[in-house]
């Protein structure tokens, strides 16, 4: 597995989260966007044709249950570069299949925070995504305690939210 995903995030840390066809059309026109989180439908080919890295949220794919077999299906039947999931077992499977991985956490309380600190060592995702992303102080603290790069997602509603998350 190469470093294309890592390099793309490093070059432009703003990641498009595509939830509709309108989002998809707009995203594919933006040259600065290099990584796309796919949160709906069967659009990997269009994302790849636009020269972007396609990360599929395996938990949200209609018709597939979020199990290891779904990760195998994505690897064998699509051009997806990687997966996003809340399930550590799917991250492990994706790593075995040389897919990029983003482990998504809903950071609701201190127990969820402690889970991140514990699981990052056993699961070893490429990135950890924390939601909501509009928590720069918590994200900054987390970044100082773990080695896995952190992506801030959810509730990023304006430029101030983007800048707060990026500086964290």
Q: Which sequence ranges carry the predicted segments?
A:
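Generic, low-specificity signal for short hydrophobic/alpha-helical stretches with a mild N-terminal bias
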Residues: 6-9, 56, 76, 98, ...
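Catalytic cores of alpha/beta
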Residues: 24-29, 69-74, 116-122, 137-152, ...
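Conserved N-terminal beta1-alpha1 strand-loop-helix module at the mouth
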Residues: 1-53, 57, 62-64, 79-80
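Ligand-binding grooves and catalytic loops that recognize ribose/phosphate and carbohydrate rings
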Residues: 43-55, 60-77, 123-126, 161-168
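Active-site-adjacent beta->alpha loops and helix N-cap segments on the catalytic face
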Residues: 3, 40-51, 63-68, 85-99, ...
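Short, structured coil segments at secondary-structure junctions
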Residues: 31-32, 50, 78-79, 97-98, ...
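Hydrophobic faces of well-ordered beta-strands that scaffold small-molecule active sites
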Residues: 13-18, 34-36, 54-58, 83-84, ...
């Amino acid at each position: 597995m190469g470093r294309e995903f890592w390099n793309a995030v490093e070059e432009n840390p703003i990641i498009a989260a595509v939830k509709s066809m309108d989002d998809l059309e707009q995203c594919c026109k933006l040259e600065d966007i290099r990584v796309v989180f796919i949160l709906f439908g069967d659009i990997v080919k269009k994302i790849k044709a636009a020269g972007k890295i396609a990360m599929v949220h395996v938990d949200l794919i209609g018709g597939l249950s979020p199990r290891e077999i779904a990760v195998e299906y994505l690897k064998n039947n699509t051009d997806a570069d990687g997966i996003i999931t809340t399930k550590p077992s799917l991250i492990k499977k994706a790593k075995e299949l040389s897919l990029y991985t983003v482990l998504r956490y809903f950071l609701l309380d201190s127990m969820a925070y402690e889970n991140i600190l514990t699981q990052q060592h056993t699961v070893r995702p490429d990135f950890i995504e924390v939601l909501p992303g509009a928590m720069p102080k918590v994200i900054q603290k987390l970044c100082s305690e773990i080695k896995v790069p952190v992506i801030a997602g959810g509730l990023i509603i304006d430029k101030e939210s983007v800048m707060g998350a990026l500086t964290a």
